[in-house]
Amino acid sequence: MARTEGDTWDIVTSVGATALVVSAMRAIEARKPEPLARDDYAQHFVAATKAEAPLFSELLEDPEAAQAPDIQLFSSYLGARTKYFDEFFLTAGNAGVRQAVILAAGLDVRGYRLPWAAGTTVYELDLPKVLEFKKQVLDEHNARATATVLDLHVDLRDDWPTVLKAAGFDPAQPTAWLAEGLLPFLPGAAQDLLFERIADLSAPGSRVAVEDFGAPGNQADRMSNAMQNEEGALQRIFKSIVEEDAPPSSLWFGDEREDPARWLTGHGWTVEATTAGELLKRYNRVPLAGEHELTDAMGQSRYFTAVLGA
């Protein structure tokens, strides 16, 4: 189904189901001999949706399927992404930041698996059905938070700053913000407003980490085309969560938007950028290059962090 301005979802439909894709890949990454990131809860999210979304469970239950080139590539890509943003939060904590905001948190469990500094509060923002599902699974497996974790049920297209401040967020204190796997799912105007709001709520010393697919027609479309064209388990998974014959990009908004790194630079933030290909080299994982359309598309995905000066 094509995206609309006020659409909504649960964990097994539309945008919500993409969080299950990420969980499945994180579970596969965690089983590798030297995982880039270890998320021991990811497999439980997949298992909890076996009846409604069997493809994800089948992937984890079939070792041969998990070894397919497309799955190994995508799990490495998401493993590198996860590690990069884990390091972002740990660096922020070492710099004295004690409040973190995970935008469109989905099935992110950093509040339960990272070694947060004492006194840290992690605010998770997402739709009610998504966060309720996550909490139910975590409770069933006796998960224990490693920080104060507050789930805030709010759509990022709505007035989320009011909800955030009502929960105790202090704009006078530095914050670590995360926008991971989020931007293509927002309309252009909502993305631009997102960064304006982040800037308005950020004290000096605040940090933001972003996965950026770039302008419409560029990286987002390359990723979508590669996922659609790469025959195998990954293609079947994405076909299961979009309309028949629709590309993965049907879940995304393709309207014009500001370049967030350029915008932040112009508003006093110092930006450092990298790509998925560079990260995989840094983490001593086989670089994404040349063998598949998917490798080239993923390798060009851009990540950046930014710090707000005094």
Curated annotation (Swiss-Prot):
Q: Which GO terms describe its molecular function?
A: methyltransferase activity
The record's section on InterPro entries has: Ppm1/Ppm2/Tcmp, SAM-dependent_MTases_sf, SAM_mthyl_Trfase_ML2640-like
Q: Which Pfam families match?
A: LCM (PF04072)
Record keywords, A-Z: Methyltransferase, S-adenosyl-L-methionine, Transferase
Enzyme nomenclature, EC number: 2.1.1.-
Q: Specify whether Methyltransferase is a keyword of the entry.
A: yes
**Which Gene Ontology BP annotations are present?**
methylation
Q: Which amino acid positions bind S-adenosyl-L-methionine, per UniProt?
A: 126, 155-156
**Keyword Transmembrane appears in the UniProt entry:** no
Q: Family per UniProt?
A: Belongs to the UPF0677 family.
State the function annotated in the UniProt record: Exhibits S-adenosyl-L-methionine-dependent methyltransferase activity.
The name of this protein is Putative S-adenosyl-L-methionine-dependent methyltransferase MAB_4587c
